[in-house]
Amino acid sequence: MTELNKLTVADSIKGLKNKDFTSTELIGAHIKQIEKHRNLNAYVTETFDLALKQAEAADQNYAQNNARTLEGIPFAAKDLFCTKGIRTTACSNILKNFIPNYESSVTQNIFDKGGVMLGKTNMDEFAMGSANITSCFGNVISPWKANDDNADLVPGGSSGGSAAAVSGFMASAALGSDTGGSVRQPASFTGLVGFKPTYGRCSRYGMISFASSLDQAGIFTRSVLDSSIMLEAMMGFDEKDSTSIKAEVPELQSAIGSSMKNMKIGVPLSLGEGSIIEPDIMKMWQDTIELLKNAGAEIVDITLPHAKYGVAVYYVIAPAEASSNLSRYDGIRYGLRVERENMTLDEMYEMTRSTGFGEEVKRRIMIGTYVLSSSGMDAYYLKAQKVRRLVANDFNNAFAKVDAILLPAAPTAAFKIGEKQNDPTIMYLNDLFTIPASLAGLPCASVPAGLSARGLPLGIQIIGKQLDEYNVLKVASTIESGVKHIKFEPKGF
């Protein structure tokens, strides 16, 4: 029998219903795996006592035939989802000992359906990063290694801990957040399915904010079916979030294995020209186009003329929103406070924030403060908002002709820890293909579609119309079936 911690969410649900094993046994197998691979630094807070207590309650519910949809299923949560009574830090020194007195809506939704939380996962500080190297708890190491090198690789970011946990069989599923690609890019780097729903589908209540008009909860799983199961549990209108969409949660699981007949897939190949895209990624993109064509889809050449400005636009709008959101961390109400004798209030603010925030967060706060200043507002911020609307219009025009759009999730495979650390511009370009859909608030997923010449996973991205998670899953499922001969599993796990 497959090791319990290697079961998918769907297979775990089936096994628990059939009484092949108990939730306590399932959770125990995951705890052992976490303890075995602590060197990866995927978790920053382990909640094993809570998990075993929840597993015991799940076993009782199964015994009484009262099992809910996710009863007894182990998951992890990125450490920016507030968890009542459990430390939540956003992996920043400024919140290192913060314990919330309320629960985020997304984690509450999963708990209400029987999910069992194993712990909180590492991340880039305040979700600012593409490699999980800005955390105050240290780097996350990917479970994957290249076949020609034993060097430690990044898992992607900012949700790198969640990606490492699921890829390394330390959780069946894990919550992430996606602002400009922070679920899709790590999923691509670690051979997982990473899904970002339509902006507003999942409540942001209790999610520590980075950029409010872009942040959206997402999910990492090892199969497309698992994504559909978790999304059905996570999504839903929430009156506590003013940006929450009042729309019915669709039935998504029937999308798996659906026919591609009459589906039109848009491919903006021009976006790959002159970019930093690696040859392996280009080949994987072309191979996936052929796969979908052979599955019955019609491939349509499209253009997204303003998508190439996405990174520039994002790094004006997101830092602007971050500088506003992070102004609340002043040492007065909660979090870190740095004091010394005879210190003025202004000095206390300055010392607290300069000590509590890391270098990347400070960089983005300074950028954001400048673009919102009187000299930067017209020159940068308002222009960026105009181009954001043009990016969204490009997608609207494309979706008048196609049902989904196909793009790589990242321009490269995973790289070595420290390799690009000192060049923020190169690091920012990692989100070249994910940012446009974020600016437009569209549902999208990364699904494993191939391996590089060095044996590293490569993800393809499917972008759908607003609120059309169903067709994104449908295309993702077809791709998953077409590459099932490839084993997306790190060696030694």
Swiss-Prot record:
InterPro entries: Amidase, Amidase_CS, Amidase_dom, AS_sf, GatA. The keyword Calcium does not apply. Its EC number is 6.3.5.7. GO terms for biological process: translation. GO terms for cellular component: glutamyl-tRNA(Gln) amidotransferase complex. Pfam families: Amidase. It comes from the Bacteria. Keywords: ATP-binding, Ligase, Nucleotide-binding, Protein biosynthesis. One of its GO terms (molecular function) is ATP binding. The active site is at residues 78, 158, 182. It is an enzyme of class 6 (ligase). It catalyses: L-glutamyl-tRNA(Gln) + L-glutamine + ATP + H2O = L-glutaminyl-tRNA(Gln) + L-glutamate + ADP + phosphate + H(+). Allows the formation of correctly charged Gln-tRNA(Gln) through the transamidation of misacylated Glu-tRNA(Gln) in organisms which lack glutaminyl-tRNA synthetase. The reaction takes place in the presence of glutamine and ATP through an activated gamma-phospho-Glu-tRNA(Gln). Heterotrimer of A, B and C subunits. Belongs to the amidase family. GatA subfamily. NCBIfam families: gatA. This is Glutamyl-tRNA(Gln) amidotransferase subunit A.
